Design a protein with these regions (language model features):
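Alpha-helical transmembrane segments of multi-pass membrane transport proteins
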Residues: 15-364
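Single conserved hydrophobic/aromatic residue that forms the stacking wall/gate
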Residues: 1-17, 21
Length: 364
């Protein structure tokens, strides 16, 4: 016997790993969703549930370090980025586990995923074939956490590493006779074949740069508009209004949960980046004034913001998943409910147990 959800568990783990270097939830949903959705449908999953799963898989992107939103938050609030990265490790893992459990319950109740089976040979070869990707991730984390280079420098080092590996791998791939075996089943490939990536040629670099620029270009106008919007809200007295409303709630938990409610509602209509730029400078000082640890509140804030990616009426990941899977937006909405419930449970747990965000921090 085997669990009914190995394909979806694979989606969540690959989404979490992909988010580490993409650092953009919608990009992860598009990439992983387009690859995994057809396989999940073939494996006996309902297409609407598979699409909703692809959308929810990208949610953890802003929590799993290194995250660009943590960098923005740290810059806005003058907090150590390395501390924020460490603070997101356990909550990010809990989010992934929570969605896996929700998925397992739903699939068990509906009998989905019965055609998917686990193979130790396939799992070990796939894990072995991922070593270069995990090495790149480890290089980023090692460099940032040891202070060898800044997050910006880490990005440059990683790009350089991937470029070198990609350019070297293709000649080796061809020389060893592996070219043309891309569609060969994993279990039939040798470990040597799995250890190499297909790579690319120098002529493909311009298209890679263009694709990267397209993704990066999404952020610039969002930041510009968010900064202007923040200034407009400031001129209109929104900052003082929100501060007065939140602080007027009274006790510790009343203030904390009011701030969380504001973040949650804003996350329904705003992307995480403008949400952070606009609300973090307003709510963080209030949270600090009632005794909430700065790193703890940062994690609370960003976990709440991440839930907005699959929360209507905006739910950016829902639109992306609908686009890449062909499942109409309104048909996949109700299948996100189990994931929303699990994420909200984890969010409340993180808010009520500060140690989940701070236990790995030094000198705490």
């Amino acid at each position: 016997p085997h669990p009914p959800t190995p394909a979806i568990n694979t989606l969540y783990l690959s989404s979490a790993a992909s988010d580490v270097y993409k650092r953009q939830n919608s990009a992860t949903t598009a990439t992983i969703g387009s690859m995994m959705h057809p396989e999940m449908v073939k494996g006996g999953y309902d297409e609407r549930f598979a699409a909703a799963t692809a959308a929810s898989g990208g949610v953890v992107g802003i929590i799993i370090p290194p995250s660009i939103i943590f960098i923005v938050y740290g810059f806005l609030l003058n907090l150590p980025i390395s501390d924020l990265f460490v603070g997101g490790i356990i909550p990010g893992a809990l989010m992934v586990i929570g969605m896996m459990v929700a998925c397992w319950i739903v699939c068990s109740m509906n009998g989905w995923g019965h055609l998917i089976s686990l193979s130790l040979n396939r799992v070990t070869k796939t894990a072995f074939g991922s070593w270069l990707g995990f090495f790149a991730i480890g290089l980023v984390l090692w460099g940032i956490y040891t202070g060898k280079f800044s997050p910006t420098e880490a990005a440059g080092v990683t790009v350089g590493f991937c470029m070198i590996v990609g350019l070297i791998s293709l000649p080796l791939y061809r020389m060893l006779g592996f070219e043309g075996n891309e569609d060969k089943p994993v279990q039939d490939k040798s470990y040597a074949e799995m250890a190499l990536v297909e790579g690319f040629t120098v002529t493909e670099i311009p298209s890679i740069v263009i694709r990267s620029a397209q993704i990066t270009g999404i952020l610039a106008p969002m930041i510009a508009v968010s900064v202007v919007m923040q200034q407009i809200l400031s001129l209109l007295g929104a900052k003082e209004t929100i501060e007065a409303f939140v602080t007027g709630m009274g006790g510790y938990y009343a203030v904390l949960f009011t701030a969380m409610a504001i973040v949650f509602v804003a996350g329904m209509v705003l992307e995480s980046l403008p949400n952070t730029i606009i609300l973090a400078p307003i709510l963080a000082p209030i949270a600090h004034s009632i005794g909430v640890d700065p790193v703890h509140f940062a994690v609370i804030f960003l976990v709440g913001g991440s839930i907005g990616f699959i929360t209507p009426p905006y739910g950016l990941n829902l639109y992306v998943a609908s686009g890449v899977t062909g499942v109409p937006y309104f048909r996949l909405l109700r299948y996100t409910v189990p994931y929303l419930m699990s994420l909200i449970f984890v969010w409340l747990l993180v808010a009520l147990v500060p140690e989940l965000s701070t236990i790995l921090l030094p000198n705490r």
